[in-house]
């Protein structure tokens, strides 16, 4: 009976853990040479008490080695795995909108009166590619991670603001439950399983059927897709070669359109059509 092959994602997780473990052991040895009283890292037991760790699961071992590297090899941790702070720009307000206005449902058109005759309305619209059907996600030979680009999603007019990006991935077939991941990597990171699993940003597990992953900025709107992603890149990892991935990309924009409001005074009301 042939030995069951180890899934690529499990293999990559062990390789990443072993890389961290080897680093912790190496640094521990170097520190002990400088200070004999230094308490180094131990995978199997608590070095301070000498007692075996109660939890030897992979998640517990990863948590322990991560904590140790953060405390005793901070520079290495920050260079390899730490999350960089995300800038938080001031909240943007669309032209003609009021800072006191409340958040409204998607697709609603809001009229904001600037004076007695002129106003601007903001219209929400979506663009997608491909338009008619989803397309297969293609990987290079002997690779199972690919970067997804969004430069084919264009606004109708220059100056339209971007609200969000939606990535649809339909997973068909496959022999294992763990289908793959969607993760955000730094701009200069290599597009590999190792970097994807070690990304400091949240990774989304994919399941059979249709998966929808939304990407939004910390501000209400941004000027471009690179601004929304903070110059980072989106990558998809396919864990099971027997499954097929099909994708479609969407972008939600806001467009300002000139409008004319009735002149005069009196009671003003709004009806929102949903």
From Swiss-Prot:
Keywords: Capsid protein, Virion. It is found in: Virion. The keyword Endoplasmic reticulum does not apply. Pfam families: RBDV_coat (PF06593). Its main location: virion. Residues 102-112 have a biased composition (Basic and acidic residues). GO terms for cellular component: viral capsid. Residues 88-112 are annotated as: Disordered. It comes from the Viruses. InterPro entries: RBDV_coat. This is Coat protein.
């Amino acid at each position: 009976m042939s030995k069951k092959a180890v899934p690529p994602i499990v293999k990559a997780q062990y390789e990443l853990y072993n890389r961290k473990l080897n680093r912790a052991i190496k640094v521990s040895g170097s520190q002990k040479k400088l200070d004999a009283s230094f308490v180094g890292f131990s995978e199997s037991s608590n070095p301070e008490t000498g007692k075996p760790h109660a939890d030897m699961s992979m998640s517990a071992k990863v948590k322990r080695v991560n904590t140790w590297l953060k405390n005793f090899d901070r520079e290495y941790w920050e260079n390899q795995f730490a999350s960089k702070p995300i800038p938080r720009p001031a909240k943007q307000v669309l032209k003609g909108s009021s800072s006191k206005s409340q958040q409204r449902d998607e697709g609603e058109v809001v009229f904001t009166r600037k004076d007695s005759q002129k106003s601007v309305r903001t219209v929400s619209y979506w663009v997608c590619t491909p338009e008619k059907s989803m397309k297969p996600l293609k990987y290079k030979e002997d690779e199972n991670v690919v970067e997804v680009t969004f430069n084919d999603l264009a606004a109708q007019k220059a100056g339209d603001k971007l609200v969000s990006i939606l990535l649809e991935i339909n997973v068909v077939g496959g022999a294992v439950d763990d289908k793959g991941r969607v993760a955000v990597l730094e701009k200069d990171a290599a597009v590999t399983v190792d970097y994807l699993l070690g990304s400091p940003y949240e990774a989304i597990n994919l399941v059979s059927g249709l998966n929808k992953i939304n990407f939004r900025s910390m501000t209400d709107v941004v000027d471009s897709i690179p601004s929304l992603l903070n110059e980072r890149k989106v990558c998809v990892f396919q864990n099971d070669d027997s499954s097929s991935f099909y994708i479609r990309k969407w972008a939600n924009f806001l467009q300002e359109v000139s409008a004319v409001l009735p002149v005069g005074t009196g009671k003003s009301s709004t009806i929102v059509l949903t």
